């Protein structure tokens, strides 16, 4: 069965971006619920002994929705950092090439996240076919992985991600999010996306050790 991963940072380390109470609900309640739901849905099925990556790429309906939400949240937590981190020269060059400048990437990313209608996720992902970085909106539980694109960065724009601290001010939440991006992690994702493609997603998920022995 699957278990809830621990946060990779202290709940009180994000300043005025997100509060410990927000993490108590978002991680401790919402994320935990997706784990519980998936365990209940796969019990006694062919997916019961499958990896999260296998479920994510081979399932549909409620099983997919809950598996995807587990992965999406896992990835979101790793995209956050209490303090600013530097992006690699390789990623910097790629963003400048694909978007014109780092400032333009930020502008496009925040605009995309702001205008995403309803609940969902806003991503930067590596397109294995074009070998370029794209900004992608996904609704509800959808993820670029199912379109064979490798996630590099994500922000959660479900209301439960920001309502406790920022009410309906999604743009304020997004601006503060950008000041807490773990660019070291994003840079690693880009490096491995170019080397291993979707295999890097499978490796990342397995490294989280969701499964009980």
Swiss-Prot record:
Keywords: Iron, Metal-binding, Oxidoreductase. It comes from the Bacteria. PROSITE patterns: SOD_MN. The keyword Translocase does not apply. Fe cation binds at residues 26, 73, 156, 160. Its EC number is 1.15.1.1. GO terms for molecular function: metal ion binding; superoxide dismutase activity. SUPFAM superfamilies: Fe,Mn superoxide dismutase (SOD), C-terminal domain, Fe,Mn superoxide dismutase (SOD), N-terminal domain. The keyword Oxidoreductase applies. Binds 1 Fe cation per subunit. Its cofactor is Fe cation. It catalyses: 2 superoxide + 2 H(+) = H2O2 + O2. Signal peptide: none annotated. It is an enzyme of class 1 (oxidoreductase). Destroys superoxide anion radicals which are normally produced within the cells and which are toxic to biological systems. Homodimer. PANTHER family: SUPEROXIDE DISMUTASE, SUPEROXIDE DISMUTASE [FE] 2, CHLOROPLASTIC. Belongs to the iron/manganese superoxide dismutase family. This is Superoxide dismutase [Fe]. It comes from Helicobacter pylori (strain J99 / ATCC 700824) (Campylobacter pylori J99). The gene is sodB.
């Amino acid at each position: 069965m699957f278990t809830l991963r621990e946060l990779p940072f202290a709940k009180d380390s994000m300043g005025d971006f997100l509060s410990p109470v927000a993490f108590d609900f978002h991680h401790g309640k919402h994320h935990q619920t997706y784990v519980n739901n998936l365990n209940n849905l796969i019990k006694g099925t062919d997916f019961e002994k499958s990896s999260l990556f296998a479920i994510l790429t081979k399932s549909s309906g409620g099983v997919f929705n809950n598996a995807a939400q587990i992965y999406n949240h896992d990835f979101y937590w790793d995209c956050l950092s209490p303090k600013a981190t530097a992006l690699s020269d390789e990623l910097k060059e790629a963003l400048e090439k694909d978007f014109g400048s780092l400032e333009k990437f930020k502008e496009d990313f925040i605009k995309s996240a702001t205008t995403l209608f309803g609940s969902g996720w806003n991503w930067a992902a590596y397109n294995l076919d074009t070998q370029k970085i794209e900004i992608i909106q996904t609704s509800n539980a959808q993820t670029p992985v199912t379109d064979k694109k490798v996630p590099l960065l994500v922000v959660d724009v479900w209301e439960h991600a920001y309502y406790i601290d920022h009410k309906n001010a999604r743009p304020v939440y997004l601006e503060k999010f950008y000041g807490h991006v773990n660019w070291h992690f994003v840079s690693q994702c880009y490096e491995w996306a170019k080397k291993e493609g979707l295999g890097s997603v499978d490796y990342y998920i397995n490294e989280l050790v969701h499964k009980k022995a």
